[in-house]
Amino acid sequence: MSQSTILTLLPETVYHNDGTSQPYDVTGNTVQAASYYLGNQDLQTVSFSFSEVTGNLVIEGTLASTPSDDDWFKVYEVSANNQANTNANLKSFTNLTGNFVYMRAKINDFNHGVVNFVKVSY
């Protein structure tokens, strides 16, 4: 089956910290995952693009049909550090397996850079 649904977990997000500001956390959109529409579908592909980012991308999923903050759990994480040039300019994807009803993306400790996008497809 080809993937035909592409949803934005986190749109372009920019933070140009000159060193005088504190890192902060960004939570993206809550979107329906594959199991929301397709019942037993458990394969999702998450793609993302960073430009000079320092922060931690966390993909979360939930099995709840009306999720509260306590219903979310981490399903994937990648750290980026612009100072050390570790994943700071990364364009990548990963396949995630799970019967998630909803998914969302977070950038924790966002200290600098541009998150161009974080998307899920199924």
Language-model-detected regions and their locations in the chain:
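Transition segment at domain starts
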Residues: M1-Q41
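N-terminal non-cleavable signal-anchor helices
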Residues: Y15, T27, Q32, T54, ...
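Beta-sandwich interaction modules
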Residues: A34-Q41, K74-Y122
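Structural beta-strand segments of beta-rich domains
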Residues: D42-V46
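Residues within well-ordered beta-strands of beta-sheet-rich folds
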Residues: S47, E60, R104-K106
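Extended, surface-exposed interaction regions
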Residues: S47-F50, L96
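Extended, low-complexity, turn-rich repeat/linker tracts enriched in Gly/Pro/Ser/Thr and Asp/Glu
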Residues: S49-L57, F110-V114
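Short, surface-exposed beta-strand/strand-loop-strand elements in extracellular ectodomains
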Residues: T54-K74, F117-S121
